[in-house]
Curated annotation (Swiss-Prot):
Compositional bias segments (type: Basic residues): 69-80
Gene Ontology CC entries for this record: histone deacetylase complex; transcription regulator complex
Residue ranges with Acidic residues bias: 36-56
Alphabetized UniProt keyword annotations: DNA-binding, Metal-binding, Nucleus, Repeat, Repressor, Transcription, Transcription regulation, Zinc, Zinc-finger
Domain ELM2: 107-192
The name this protein goes by in its record: REST corepressor spr-1
One annotated GO molecular function: zinc ion binding
Compositionally biased region (Polar residues): 378-402
Quaternary structure and partners: Probably part of a large repressor complex. Interacts with histone demethylase spr-5/lsd-1.
PROSITE patterns registered for this protein in UniProt: ELM2 (PS51156), GATA_ZN_FINGER_2 (PS50114), SANT (PS51293)
Zn finger limits (GATA-type): 271-325
UniProt superkingdom: Eukaryota
Amino acid sequence: MDLYDDDGESAQSEKVDVPSEESTIAGPETDIPAETIEENVPEVEENTLLEEDSLVDVDSPRPSQQRSKPSKSKRKRKRSSSGESSAAEPEIDAGAKVKGPLSNTNKEINVGTEFQAKIADLNLNDKACNEDRDDQDELIWNTPETIDDEKLEAFIRESSDRYLIPIDRALYILTINNFNFDSAIAEVARRNELKDVWTDQEITLFENCYQIFGKNFSQIRSALCHRSLQSIVQFYYESKKRVKYLNFVNSKCDDSSSSEETETPSPYPEAIFESMCDNCGEKAENMQINNAMNRPECRACLIYFNQTGVPRPTSLRLVLAERIRNQVSCPDNMKEYMKDFDKLSAQATGSTFQKRIIVKDQCVEYIIDVDKIPSSSCTENGNVGETSSPSAQKTEIQSESDGSGPLIWRHKKTVCMEEIEVLADDSRRKMFEACQHGSKVDIKLVASWKNDMTNLRKRVEQTYYDPDLNPTYLFSHDRVHYSQDWTQLERSQVIRCFNMYGAHFEHIADVIGTKTPDQVYQFYLENQKAIDAADEEFLADMKNPERLADMEEEEDSI
């Protein structure tokens, strides 16, 4: 570059490297011959050069005063067939070193070991490789070589059938317990998994909502607001293998096509199709009339009403509040028992049966093995398996079933179940004892006593009296006066009536006929101890068959 001073003379000159057309076209240094490059250089017409020379201004400064810009020539790629291009390409030696970039002008792919990246070998024992990994996989099950296949099958059958544990979960529990079947089955027995059970109405409502909203679970939850989003998604993937939801989508398309063919004009105004739902208050595109409620509702509210018969709740808070209002409270007579709920719901140990055993000193006649202590579990009935207590020895599963019928498992007994069974046994024993005492009573003697009491009552209550016997009673209007003195016969009769009727003074006065209820009551107060002693003696005589025979002989002699 030339520099000029104030007088216009050249003060210093530098040489500036100006790239020429050949250097621009050549590009990166490669082993490609120059003949190939010259074929791609466009031809410049001479007329264009003459026009440029004619447009040069005479008064313009010298060329040395202007910076020369590198001339850019446009490349013109010639289109040729694949055969011509392959013929024109020069042969490149495979061993020659390529000095240009990997992607050269010929668009060749460099293949070979020298073009590959060098990656160090993976060392599995290096802890630095696994320190920053949070998504490490965990081994659930790997069948060992020394495990007993029969015990393994028995463990899987017991875990899945009896405790309703998934097989993969049971195998994982066995793995973390170092393949110890006893400790693994003990841990499985402590696990109680609560399953989310869906009713038929909820399943139908979910299927209808799936036709409308597809896999938009948040919209489906608006119809099943008492269900959480996690529960809905879990139910979808659990039932996905059993129910092909693609059929619901196809049926939706078929219904839409058929509805277009048989479309009938709606009698309702078009304004309701753009209004808000009267139930949930949300705006929907396709509003429908609920004929039962006589109001426009969205499709979700209408489906819920058709399936359940009640309006769809608009929020989970209202549903929970309604459940709390309708919740059945514990009765007052059961609150005392609910204080010991944890104690009664504990696993049975057989201590209740141990307490009710009558020892030898309390027995009149002691017989061995009459009242054995049953186990703390349900007894077998056909193919019903017995669930023994933790202290008892566990039996093999194969010995409980003969293969001809299903193996039914029952839950272990609780303390409450033992208490109920003890009460049932005691009530049956009391009923048997009452039947035995009833068989000792002479039914004919009791019937004769009742007959005598009936005759006495009839004699007192009869309205016809002989004038020769009671003339003063018929013709006198004065009140009948009863004597205050008690004869020996009246005393024996009233004590006997107290044994039969208890403290019913009016009935006793009617049976005796010569005393009023007040007189009988006064006699009871004066002789209460003697009446109670006679009552106890009467009950003892009723229980003693020998005494009953003596009483019959005394009555016969009388």
